[in-house]
């Protein structure tokens, strides 16, 4: 990975953490998470990458932003992204410690993603005897 891109990823996670930190101890998990998501998405969209979120905030119909399959960036190398803008929403809302922003980036098609339950055809599974 390009050294400059690695430094930019530090900035992305830092921006998300700082946005969430404004909600420490305020009791509102959704506001803390939304602040982190908004900040991380804004930063990701400023990078010169063609990114695809492969591990994110959930399926498209469950998460308005940073959902699995969402495209981010301004164009550049194709990359897969795994992220959690705020790991520890309850901790943050209650004023606790050790919440974090998480992001990983790899070349296109190199991050493993497990299939969602919707992708599994259970009728093809052998029945247990």
Language model features with spans:
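Short, exposed beta-strand "edge-strand" segments with a Pro/Gly-rich flavor and a Y/T-containing core
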Residues: 77, 120-121
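DPxDG-like acidic metal-binding loop motif
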Residues: 77-87, 91-110
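Short, flexible micro-motifs
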Residues: 59-61, 91, 119
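Conserved small/polar residues in nucleotide/adenosyl-binding loops
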Residues: 112-119
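N-terminal subdomain of lithium-sensitive/metallo-dependent phosphomonoesterases centered on the IMPase/IPPase/PAP
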Residues: 1-82
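Short, hydrophobic secondary-structure boundary micro-motifs
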Residues: 53, 122-123
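Hydrophobic alpha-helical segments, chiefly the membrane-spanning helices
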Residues: 124-129
């Amino acid at each position: 990975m390009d050294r400059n891109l690695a430094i930019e990823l530090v900035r992305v996670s830092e921006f998300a953490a700082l946005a969430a930190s404004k909600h420490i101890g305020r009791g509102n998990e959704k506001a803390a998470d939304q602040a982190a998501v908004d900040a991380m998405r804004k930063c990701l969209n400023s990078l010169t990458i063609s990114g695809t979120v492969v591990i994110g905030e959930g399926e498209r119909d469950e998460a308005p932003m940073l959902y699995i399959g969402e495209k981010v960036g301004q164009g550049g190398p194709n990359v897969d992204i795994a992220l959690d803008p705020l790991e520890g929403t309850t901790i943050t809302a209650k004023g606790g410690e050790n919440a974090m922003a998480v992001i990983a980036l790899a070349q296109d098609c190199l991050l493993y993603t497990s299939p969602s339950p919707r992708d599994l055809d259970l009728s093809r599974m052998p029945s247990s005897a």
